[in-house]
Amino acid sequence: MAAALQVLPRLARAPLHPLLWRGSVARLASSMALAEQARQLFESAVGAVLPGPMLHRALSLDPGGRQLKVRDRNFQLRQNLYLVGFGKAVLGMAAAAEELLGQHLVQGVISVPKGIRAAMERAGKQEMLLKPHSRVQVFEGAEDNLPDRDALRAALAIQQLAEGLTADDLLLVLISGGGSALLPAPIPPVTLEEKQTLTRLLAARGATIQELNTIRKALSQLKGGGLAQAAYPAQVVSLILSDVVGDPVEVIASGPTVASSHNVQDCLHILNRYGLRAALPRSVKTVLSRADSDPHGPHTCGHVLNVIIGSNVLALAEAQRQAEALGYQAVVLSAAMQGDVKSMAQFYGLLAHVARTRLTPSMAGASVEEDAQLHELAAELQIPDLQLEEALETMAWGRGPVCLLAGGEPTVQLQGSGRGGRNQELALRVGAELRRWPLGPIDVLFLSGGTDGQDGPTEAAGAWVTPELASQAAAEGLDIATFLAHNDSHTFFCCLQGGAHLLHTGMTGTNVMDTHLLFLRPR
């Protein structure tokens, strides 16, 4: 926690307006104590889904080291283990797998983001790196998370390895978010450029992510169960780190080891809907015309075991345990927070106000209208399994400090050229919302952080705020509305109190979306 404590000197040096001095020192100390606890909980959430712990929970060897157990399945090991992987977190996953199973590993190929090895070396995260003479070949590509020639070479190497396997072999597949861009393998004669152009045109005309994935799978050799088909008749164990709300295995990295449920008619329907069927390249028409109704039929995936080994749910569960150990009543609201960042910020701001009335009954309570508005915002966000009533009841009966936890990914409509990410923007918007409501004798802190350690094109993972944010910003001449209008949340937090509110972790080597923490502590 040394890094977290470094913010104390910066805050001590930060200018305080004379009118704000009375009581500011006490509130500052309280905020810093909450901020330190928030960082602890965030780090515990990330720690629960780091590659090493995840792989060791998912895999185990018998005492003789000749049998691999995955869930309730056993696989014989006799120098027959092969490994492939693709995704932003796969380098560390492969390193953990090599540490556990290296003596049985014959060959491996992984596709990871460009520059990730150097970044891990700079961060001193040796546990995320393969051994010097590893049997796993590493390809770096997909710069800026876009398919490119380097990623294509990696995908073809993965395909070649899979196609050479026999019924006696076992293929371990490591998958994480970002895997789709790192596994581009168009069906010939379609080229990578033609496939990219088509998906860009569809996106520009309003196609949904589900529709885009349907087209990608239909034109790919490896997506939509294609990798599983290539590896047949070998046994396939797919270990998946989910960065998608709800953990749908067919969506994560476009489901290379999950049979596609879509057919050519689905593709043609999508292309017709967006007026692109007539303008298709000849190569795309050729592939679609010769494809079977179900190119990677379900029968090809009976030899596959797909296992989610890490998710936002697991990360939040660990943070909840840590919060309870610190004396908080902790409730997980949802691991599927999604929707517009403005609406989400309004929800968290109003939730803090309504929660305050439950924790401090002597204060004026939330009006019926405010209570109804909170539920309307929740309905607008369409959050599945939202535990809002449980959270409010916990506060009404407990009367102690409360920590509300959530995870997911809000969406941000870009309207400016500033620097930031969805976590810093959400935190800034929540900070602006908190000033709208009288919170009384209660300390409130909100933190939003990306579990991969990188929020947008910045070096911060996220940020934390308190109800004093608006007055702190005004004291330093910072106009919150102006920064939000330009999506410039990172610049704002860099300027505010010397960057003390930024959450810095460095690249974590994992990714299970974002973590939101709302602390409410009666004084």
Curated annotation (Swiss-Prot):
<keyword id="KW-0808">Transferase</keyword>
<dbReference type="GO" id="GO:0008887">
    <property type="term" value="F:glycerate kinase activity"/>
</dbReference>
<dbReference type="GO" id="GO:0006468">
    <property type="term" value="P:protein phosphorylation"/>
</dbReference>
<keyword id="KW-0597">Phosphoprotein</keyword>
<dbReference type="Pfam" id="PF13660">
    <property type="entry name" value="DUF4147"/>
</dbReference>
<dbReference type="GO" id="GO:0005739">
    <property type="term" value="C:mitochondrion"/>
</dbReference>
<dbReference type="InterPro" id="IPR039760">
    <property type="entry name" value="MOFRL_protein"/>
</dbReference>
<keyword id="KW-0547">Nucleotide-binding</keyword>
<keyword id="KW-0418">Kinase</keyword>
<dbReference type="InterPro" id="IPR007835">
    <property type="entry name" value="MOFRL"/>
</dbReference>
<keyword id="KW-0496">Mitochondrion</keyword>
<keyword id="KW-0963">Cytoplasm</keyword>
<keyword id="KW-0225">Disease variant</keyword>
<feature type="modified residue" description="Phosphoserine">
    <location>
        <position position="60"/>
    </location>
</feature>
<dbReference type="InterPro" id="IPR025286">
    <property type="entry name" value="MOFRL_assoc_dom"/>
</dbReference>
<dbReference type="InterPro" id="IPR038614">
    <property type="entry name" value="GK_N_sf"/>
</dbReference>
<dbReference type="GO" id="GO:0005829">
    <property type="term" value="C:cytosol"/>
</dbReference>
<dbReference type="GO" id="GO:0005524">
    <property type="term" value="F:ATP binding"/>
</dbReference>
<protein>
    <recommendedName>
        <fullName>Glycerate kinase</fullName>
        <ecNumber>2.7.1.31</ecNumber>
    </recommendedName>
</protein>
<keyword id="KW-0067">ATP-binding</keyword>
<dbReference type="Pfam" id="PF05161">
    <property type="entry name" value="MOFRL"/>
</dbReference>
<dbReference type="GO" id="GO:0005737">
    <property type="term" value="C:cytoplasm"/>
</dbReference>
<dbReference type="GO" id="GO:0005794">
    <property type="term" value="C:Golgi apparatus"/>
</dbReference>
<comment type="similarity">
    <text>Belongs to the glycerate kinase type-2 family.</text>
</comment>
<dbReference type="InterPro" id="IPR037035">
    <property type="entry name" value="GK-like_C_sf"/>
</dbReference>
<dbReference type="GO" id="GO:0061624">
    <property type="term" value="P:fructose catabolic process to hydroxyacetone phosphate and glyceraldehyde-3-phosphate"/>
</dbReference>
